[in-house]
Curated annotation (Swiss-Prot):
Recorded GO CC terms: prospore membrane; prospore membrane leading edge
Protein name per its UniProtKB record: Sporulation-specific protein 1
Biased composition (Polar residues): 67-86, 95-121, 486-499
Its job: Involved in the pathway that organizes the shaping and sizing of the prospore membrane (PSM) during sporulation. May be required for the formation of ADY3 and DON1-containing protein coats at the leading edge of the PSMs during meiosis II.
GO biological process: ascospore wall assembly; ascospore-type prospore membrane formation; cell division
Lineage of origin: Eukaryota, Fungi, Dikarya, Ascomycota, Saccharomycotina
PTM text: Phosphorylated.
Compartments where found: Prospore membrane
Coiled coil: 469-486, 542-566
Length: 571
């Protein structure tokens, strides 16, 4: 039942005297009246055509089935008007319908008088931001942890201020408190897991050895494989045991550091309470009051105690904890080095066995290992492959090698041709042992394009002295080869003196082009002749035949003719 009091927007304007308790009872009645008008407006909008309603008003903002609103129509039937009202977002734009002009959105025209008649003091307290605000990204710090020093007391240290103490801690600590006791429990859990791992590995080795003994066949390859696997897991068991013991030692020594932390927390709480009492005394009693002076002295003593405890705590963290984890790092380094040696030996033996049994699988496994090692090598030396793309491609495809400890050990153990390291390619010089030893063979030339190029350099045409001993040795070898061929055939033996005579006639009768070609062959193969003379036994000049001396004289004559006529006729 409605009370006799008037509303603020009552048109009658009659003022009735009501008690304060009765005025407080008017608010729910006014709320029901607004709700009735709000639902009535939604009912009227429901009879409008869909053409008049913009697209943004056709969206369902209440996908849950339980969130519905009902209104009674003229016939008393219940009608669902859930989709007739909603709260539009800031990003959506469109004409504002009467269905959204409610007291919730602040666009109700009928209640504009009520908004105007509000107390201006209440209006000033309303937030000036829009209806929908984005939540702030930063989580507020725990302001109740320490009290700020509002008055900048010179007797108080800067460490007692709220910002300097809590700014070093992340904001996630406001959601969950993590202490060294929690970290100690985690270390104990890791140590227990490590212990469980090496115990499980011991069971695995026991089972696999029992399987090997109970098997009926005796295959040497299988037995060697089981023993190699046993070595790997034995080393890993030793590694896990050492790490588990080291973690247990760290956990035991953490008790001392946890005590320091607990003491620091207690001293911080005492200092926080003293700061609160001191701040209240300054506000209510003044700074010159005796109680304020006593509290200030208490704050100073609490501050000094807190600083001493904090100093000891920092020492325990920076020195004691560092020493404990240094022992753990040393254990990792030592055991990992032993694991690398055992693993390298296993890889060498396995690849050597695959090379003899299955060549295809051997090549695939070796290529996988090489690519994985190259990826690690390239990531350490050159993170960006665009710096040297050609070098990256050559190493990746195996054209060029790279300096890797594991691959060097594998290549040294395995007997097959592999891509050498770049340093080896530069230092090694291939020997032409299979090439026939012929004076006129230009393939044996050791001159590069800049020293012996007939187009770019005149040094190519310069005369070079040929030693008679080299010619004698060369002709003697040619004679031996021809004699070996003639023995197999039934043809008559040709006199050896005919060949030098034919060469002499050709040198004298041909034109300058042929002479230049002959000179080029002689000059180019000068270094090859020197290399060949080292490999062969030396022949004394006294044992040389008369035919060899005639050939040497013919070559000297040809050399002189070349020097005189080389530039007269163009090539």
């Amino acid at each position: 039942m409605r009370s006799s009091g008037t509303y603020e927007n009552d048109p009658s304007g009659e003022i009735t005297s009501t008690s304060p308790k009765q005025s407080k009872q008017k608010k729910p009645t006014k709320f029901r009246e607004r709700m009735r008008r709000w639902l009535q407006n939604g009912k009227n909008n429901n009879h409008q055509g869909e053409e008049d309603v913009p697209e943004i008003f056709n969206k369902n903002f209440y996908p849950q089935t339980g969130m519905t609103a009902f209104n009674n129509n003229d016939n008393g039937e219940v009608q669902d008007v859930t989709n007739n009202f909603f709260l539009p977002s800031e990003d959506e734009s469109g004409p504002v319908q009467s269905s959204v002009k409610t007291f919730l959105t602040g666009n109700n025209d009928e209640d504009s008088n009520f908004q105007q008649n509000q107390n201006p003091k209440q209006k000033s307290e309303l937030p000036k931001s829009p209806y929908r605000q984005k939540p702030t990204q930063e989580i507020a710090l725990l302001k109740d942890l320490f009290v700020t020093n509002k008055y900048d007391d010179p007797y108080l240290n800067s460490s007692t201020r709220f910002g300097n103490i809590t700014s070093t801690f992340p904001s996630s600590l406001s959601l969950r408190t993590v202490t060294l006791q929690t970290i100690k429990k985690r270390i104990d859990c890791i140590s227990a897991k490590k212990k469980e791992v090496w115990k499980t590995e011991e069971k695995f080795l026991k089972d696999i050895l029992m399987w090997l003994q109970s098997s009926n066949f005796e295959d040497p390859d299988t037995i060697s494989l089981i023993h190699e696997i046993e070595k790997i897991f034995e080393e890993d068991i030793h590694f896990e045991q050492n790490v588990s013991d080291c973690l247990k030692e760290i956990s035991n020594n953490f008790e001392y550091i946890c005590m320091r932390e607990t003491q620091l927390i207690n001293e911080g709480n005492i200092l926080k309470n003293d700061l609160k009492k001191y701040a209240k005394a300054r506000e209510h009693k003044g700074e010159k009051h005796e109680d304020t002076e006593v509290l200030r002295e208490k704050v100073i003593s609490s501050q000094k105690s807190f600083d001493v405890t904090k100093r000891h705590y920092k020492h325990a963290i920076s020195i004691t904890t560092r020493q404990l984890f240094m022992n753990l790092a040393f254990e990792y380094y030592e055991n990992c080095s032993d694991m690398k040696d055992i693993s390298r030996k296993y890889l060498q033996e396995s690849l050597s066995t695959l090379q003899t049994i299955d060549t295809l699988s051997f090549s695939e496994e070796l290529e996988k290992i090489r690519k994985r090692r190259f990826d690690k090598f390239w990531a350490k030396t050159n993170p960006d492959p665009t710096n040297n793309i050609q070098k990256f491609v050559n190493m990746r495809t195996g054209v060029a090698g790279f300096n890797d400890s594991l691959m060097n050990h594998l290549y040294g153990k395995l007997s097959f041709g592999v891509a050498p390291v770049e340093e080896e390619l530069q230092n090694s010089q291939p020997e032409h042992t299979d090439v026939p030893e012929n004076v006129w063979n230009e393939v044996l030339s050791d001159y590069n394009s800049m020293d012996g190029n007939p187009i770019t350099s005149n040094k190519f045409l310069s005369a070079k002295e040929l030693e008679p001993d080299q010619l004698v040795e060369l002709l003697a070898q040619e004679k031996e080869e021809k004699e070996a061929k003639n023995i197999s055939s039934s043809t008559a033996e040709v006199p050896s003196i005919s060949q030098p005579e034919i060469k002499k006639e050709n040198l004298e009768s041909n034109d300058s082009l042929i002479l230049r070609s002959t000179k080029r062959n002689v000059n180019v193969n000068a270094a090859s002749l020197r290399n060949l003379s080292i490999k062969k036994t030396q022949v004394k000049p006294e044992s040389a035949s008369e035919e060899s001396k005639v050939l040497a004289a013919a070559l000297n004559d040809a050399k002189q003719n070349l020097d005189e006529n080389v530039w007269r006729t163009p090539i």
